[in-house]
Amino acid sequence: MSLNIAIVGATGNVGREMLNILSDRKYDSSNIFPVASSKSEGTKVEFGDKELIVEAIDKFDPAKVDLALFSAGASVSKEWAPMFAEKNCIVIDLSLIHI
């Protein structure tokens, strides 16, 4: 079974590195959802030899994913991580705000 994964903060350095790691491990791009702020909506991020389109976090449906990797900073995590968790999504937050 493949997990559907949201990379929240996909346009930042850590988010791009997470995309690189998943691509290097041959994860299917159809299971990856790059997410960022509304100002980044529609931009493209590299995923191996493919480009994925970034979705705005305020329009993204957390029910689409099984796992969300947050690397967008404490304020984003504080606001959005609980909403992802409420949709039965596993949340891994690198901001440490929820510790």
Which sequence ranges carry the predicted segments?
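N-terminal Rossmann-like NAD(P) cofactor-binding subdomain of oxidoreductases
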Residues: 1-97
